[in-house]
Amino acid sequence: MTISIDKSVKKAEPSIFDLCDDWLKRDRFVFIGWSGLLLLPCAYFALGGFFTGNTFVTSWYTHGLASSYLEGCNVLTAAVSTPSNAMGHSLLLLWGPEAQGDFTRWCQLGGLWTFTALHGAFGLIGFMLRQFEIARAVKIRPYNAIAFSGPIAVFVSVFLIYPLGQQSWFFAPSFGVAAIFRFILFFQGFHNWTLNPFHMMGVAGVLGAALLCAIHGATVENTLFEDGDAANTFRAFNPTQSEETYSMVTANRFWSQIFGVAFANKRWLHFFMLFVPVTGLWMSAIGVVGLALNLRAYDFVSQEIRAAEDPEFETFYTKNLLLNEGIRAWMAAQDQPHENLVFPEEVLPRGNAL
């Protein structure tokens, strides 16, 4: 007796999710992925808002300033400025009660700033998710995405959390080079930011990372190629040699002779290079969150009291406090004209009086 077995297995119809997943993760020149659904439109709108504001939109109604190429600014002085203080923390939606669907009025009120800031934040988050997604696809660990959390933390703390802790979006940085410089001066004058321990950790992390990057790049470059006999150093390294001669042992021996210590293995070396800048950025972001709550930096009150009592006693610290007072006196009246702040002539710093 012959028994026939039907081996055909009926496959389930792919769901809409499966079809979308297949299309999004298809191998193409520019990977899209699920993260691309967040990244690509947000990055497009953020960059579009930035370039539109820089090119066409004035800050006359929000800061009393010219801030566009159309008004005569250049690439360093143009900016997408924050909304006026009167707008508070409104999202300034185009269809909201402030602009009421009027695009021109929306631009005048500073709507492009909230548009750019929010789309920029979600665009950065989308880029981090993109790194997670591709790392999973090619089966590597997601340390790139974890490292990118540092820039995201700084952006969100400076552009979103800090102004949320203050009166309004007005106190956030505008999107422009000179505008960021003004914001840095504001941070110093009103928060004594350079004496904040979190700022110190941030500087140590960023500059330390630059030093580590330079040392690491030079060391690897030094050991990639075999040294030759030519008198000229650059002729001695032959980039056309058949094999690289990179050696962790050689590099370890070099730095052991230089410093007396060296990294024992590649994993610890590269984790340290990851840890230093990311921790620095996170510490800086935490410090900015503290400033949003108006937490103070270091105060050396004993020096302040002695400087007030003894005209011959002055330190760099007390001198910096005087400079901060000057920044506040000049900047508050000019930067917040709506407050109608008036300072008597005798309290304003003049020339080299500081």
UniProtKB/Swiss-Prot annotation:
EC code: 1.10.3.9
CDD domains: Photosystem-II_D2
Topology relative to the membrane: Multi-pass membrane protein
Keyword set, alphabetical order: Acetylation, Chlorophyll, Chloroplast, Chromophore, Electron transport, Iron, Magnesium, Membrane, Metal-binding, Oxidoreductase, Phosphoprotein, Photosynthesis, Photosystem II, Plastid, Thylakoid, Transmembrane, Transmembrane helix, Transport
Residues recorded with modification N-acetylthreonine: 2
Top enzyme class: oxidoreductase
Function, as annotated: Photosystem II (PSII) is a light-driven water:plastoquinone oxidoreductase that uses light energy to abstract electrons from H(2)O, generating O(2) and a proton gradient subsequently used for ATP formation. It consists of a core antenna complex that captures photons, and an electron transfer chain that converts photonic excitation into a charge separation. The D1/D2 (PsbA/PsbD) reaction center heterodimer binds P680, the primary electron donor of PSII as well as several subsequent electron acceptors. D2 is needed for assembly of a stable PSII complex.
PANTHER family: PHOTOSYSTEM II D2 PROTEIN, PHOTOSYSTEM II PROTEIN D1
Similarity remark: Belongs to the reaction center PufL/M/PsbA/D family.
Name of the featured protein: Photosystem II D2 protein
Organism: Mesostigma viride (Green alga)
